[in-house]
């Protein structure tokens, strides 16, 4: 069983953002979604405002990419990248 945590979802596609929230609620009931935003700059502001433990980040977003958001949050939260683009897979781990 996974323990309680606070999470941020950053995904520019509204339907995908909502679907991810639903799946996370079903799979990890003790996870509190503190913010769900549609662009990278809003994600950075939400990190500062809410201090999430886990970030679920789309890689390709307006404002700032998920990679930029991950660098911004480095050391403050665990990062899970959510993307359908194969070409970003290697960059996400660098």
Regions found by a protein language model. Give the residues of each.
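CheY-like receiver
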Residues: 45, 49-94
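Charged docking surfaces used in two-component/phosphorelay signaling
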Residues: 18-26
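Generic structural signal for conserved hydrophobic packing positions in ordered secondary structure
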Residues: 20, 37, 89-92
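A generic structural motif
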Residues: 28-34, 77
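Non-catalytic signal-transmission and effector/linker regions of two-component phosphorelay proteins
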Residues: 1-8
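Conserved Asp/Asn-Gly motif in the active-site loop of CheY-like receiver
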Residues: 34-41
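Conserved acidic carboxylate
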Residues: 11
